[in-house]
Amino acid sequence: MRITHDIHNHTTLSRCCYDPRATAAAFIERTEELGHTVFGISNHLWDEKVPGASAWYKNQMISYGLQLRDCLPRDSRGLKVLLGVETEYAAASDTLGMLAETAKQFDYVLVPHSHTHMRDFVMEDNADARALRAIFAERIAAALPELSAEQVKKMANTLGYTDIDAIVASGRFFEPTVDMEKYVADKMVESFNSLMANSEFIKLAAAVPTSVAHPFMPCGFQKEVQRRIINLIPDEVLLDSFSRASALGVAIEVNTASLRFPEDDYAEEPHVRMMKLALKAGCRFTFGTDSHSLAGLDSIRKGDDFSRVVGIGEENLADIVR
């Protein structure tokens, strides 16, 4: 099937967008060239009515995101142009970053559950990471007794998750006790299922077309690690999770940026197994590039062969993208 829509991408209004050319007008022009019929823009936003936004989200509130309306060109080039949003599910506190009532201002909502690089916000630090930070805090306090407890804590938390994970794995301070890949796999299953049970999410999904962004894709890891983590999740567990989404009428996103192994007709791509199980569970699908650049929109073509391999046809697409 040739994919003729893309409803997951980020313009310069998203803080993570790195391409100054990634404007709504430029996106629409390129998507017409790609042969799309439906195009939706989904910048990262957090509802200011919901407490608990991370520092990264605090400057990306609803009023800010709605400025996109003024950026859309009058000539949509025959495209069905949608104003969407990618909000957040902070699984560590079971907090959905958008109220259902607020979501009605958008044509659709994408909800990720696997931003596993957002530690202690989306995914809790594991016991080893906490133990390492405690060692740092103890040594900083001993070396610099003039610092307050809060200042010591800030210094101990200075290193990001990639450094912390690497130091733990090295065994320089202690022998690791947590299988990190299994931990992440289990946490993603936990976060997906808790999202499906979240009362605000259930209301939101009933109010606005909703799709789970890059499901079970552990963000922030190298591609070989990502593949191993996904492959740790058993078929029956994925089928159960996708059945919960299907029961709520929640779509599943095929995120072309997450398709990291296109060789030999995606023979080693873990998303093939995953999406076949979503199809078996009766889920509908949306496709998105998750592009943060103008050039990234072209990756939608990965979806053509991928949909054929999985068996996704027009009849399996969510209504919003038809």
Question: How would you describe each model-predicted region?
Answer:
Residues 254, 262-287, 295, 299-304:
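Extended hydrophobic/aromatic segments used for targeting, binding, or gating
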